Amino acid sequence: MATRPQDQWSLRIVNAETGTGKTTLLTILLGMMGKLNTDHRLLVATPFKDEASRLANDINRIAGTPTFAIAQHGEAKGAYTISGKYPCKVITTNAYIRALHDDERRETLYAYGQDEKRGLTIIDEALSPVSVYKMTADSASRIDAGLPEDIILEYGMAAHTLNEIKRARNEYLETGVASFLPFKLHKDTDRLLKAVQDSKEVNSEFKHEFENTVNMLRAYASDTSTRFVISEGRAHAFYAAQSEPILTVPAVILDATAELNLTYALLPKSKVQWVPIRPMRNYRNATLRVLMNIGTGKNAVGTNTDNKLNKLWRYTAKYRLEDIDTAIFSHLNTRDAFNELHKRETVRLDNNPRMSWGYYGKLNGLNEYKECHNLITASFPHQTEGWAISLFEALRGIQTEDWRKGKADRQFIDNNGREYADIVNAIRSSYYAYTIIQEINRIAIRKNVSADGDCPVVSIVHMWAADSLAFQALMAVKKTMTNINLVFDYGFSWEDSDASRLKKLLHVLTFTPPPYRMVATELVRNILEGEERDKADLATLKARREDPFADELKPTEITKPEVQKIWERLAKEISKNQIVAKKVLQAMKIDIRKSAGKPTLIVKS
């Protein structure tokens, strides 16, 4: 697409499914261009150093020459110049950013050809929707630079109220994790950066991440407006101070979840074209069991951690088959808590060769979990409304002083007429959806086992916050992974009491948006049937592993008498707290009456 000399588009976003071989096809394309000896000059940006080196070697192997592609991610001023000897340069996305913000090196990013028009820039896995950089308290404590102890980098958005900033500081002190987007440079940032670089106690990975973060901060703190697309744990700046994009040659971005990403909608329409690719994968052999629960965010296991993690481990045991590799994805601090339990032999994790760990922010594009047929997530990424507000405003550019001072008079409507609150909400829900899709596609589901694109039989157990935001994200996941087997399980709770279980059910029904009828149906079909359905699902899963294409093996259905029995049990539980339940039932268009002394639920229409 972008190799035509007179192409009018400066930027194309190619949206294809995770695991469909985008990088492989990119390698073949560039290798064949080298083999055919075209006059193109190519620049490729990819997230990781080792991947850049591997990509360059693979391109040369297909091109049949060792002098077509070269991986360069150093910091020398001429490191990014496209020379005649190596028509194709492969660099890291972070190196691309550094050169983009360096006046002396910016010109070297232009992949000019012989006629200064036939250049191509390809950015692999860059337009991921919005995350934040996180620093753990343990990492920060190893940096002895005499800096303030409360927080290293301060929030700088006037949109944050004083209480929001205080909450962020308290969050950092209590959990060791703080969200740093957007923000201003701390007065001691340069000293901190030097301390990090010189420290022998800080590992190289953290040094690399922190350096990239500081570079991002400097761009935010500049006097000019910089537009960012933030990837999982990394920042990618494609637009600088000018109103026009910096990319003056055709560029292509490959992204698996662009449809869920609000950022592409905020980019200049005259210079950006979104190119969706038809889905090619069939998820009919995958089962996603959603554990609906209150408080499944990153702090969900913060109190009474031992008991909570033990409960999660016991609960998911029935979905883990001993002869099947299992991946566990969580926050890094949750993993540390699991390891503490392991030391006391409460649970066994690290010594189990069939268990693989991964943590949020380090999963994008990885293939090391592709042999795992089970996936369990402990806790779930969560971002506050203040974070989404900050992100939206950061994408629009740095605000004026008048905007900062006049909070009551701000116009929260974008150029397309959409209300500001709707965009902020969509950004948050898209983050949920994007994260779970990326996680699921790390495991064996990314393989094809038939000509129809069927994936292997996999089982995913996922905790999900019981609120409307998570529900919207879940619908986005269902839309993207159309025929995945989705099972709601409201039976999981950190607490074991019946009172907390009922409270959770009412919370789910109160804050879950329409269609309420579907929620009620899933509630009936999954929570009150208990262990019998779990056993049936597990038996079906085992049978399908033996013959994944057996048409006669269908998920267990509930017969009409069983439905009536479940309705009666649900009515009995809700009737214990009719004051709270009245509003819920009205919203669901359900009456609760007593018949022969027993509570009964009546659907109005």
What is the predicted role of each segment?
Residues 1-605:
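ASCE RecA-like P-loop NTPase motor cores
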